[in-house]
């Protein structure tokens, strides 16, 4: 699988897509993400780990909590990973 396809595959999962969407509002505590994306804590942790490994989000510990932030280049990287026709708005 190409790097572009792998990046899109990470973002395409419904839970991870919801997390990315929530993080477009800005830095968010994991406790708030749990409220916005109602999945079990271990499932949330797994999906956040995959997004971190893909470089789409960053994490910073604040006491016993972790704050998550959308990576500065995340949206640009996702846009660049799209097929050219999708980026240009062309229709088949």
Language-model segments: residues:
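Alpha-helical residues within the helix-turn-helix
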Residues: 35, 52-53
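Pre-recognition alpha-helix immediately N-terminal to the DNA-recognition helix
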Residues: 6, 17-19
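Base-recognition residues in the alpha-helical recognition helix of bacterial helix-turn-helix
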Residues: 21, 45-49, 64
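Beta-hairpin "wing" of winged helix-turn-helix
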Residues: 53-62, 69
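Short helix-coil-helix linker/hinge
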Residues: 9-15, 72-73
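Short capping segments at the starts of secondary-structure elements
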Residues: 14-15, 25-31
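Helix-turn-helix DNA-binding motif, specifically the short coil turn and the N-cap/start of the second
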Residues: 29, 40-43
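Amphipathic alpha-helical dimerization/coiled-coil segments
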Residues: 1-3, 21-24, 72-92
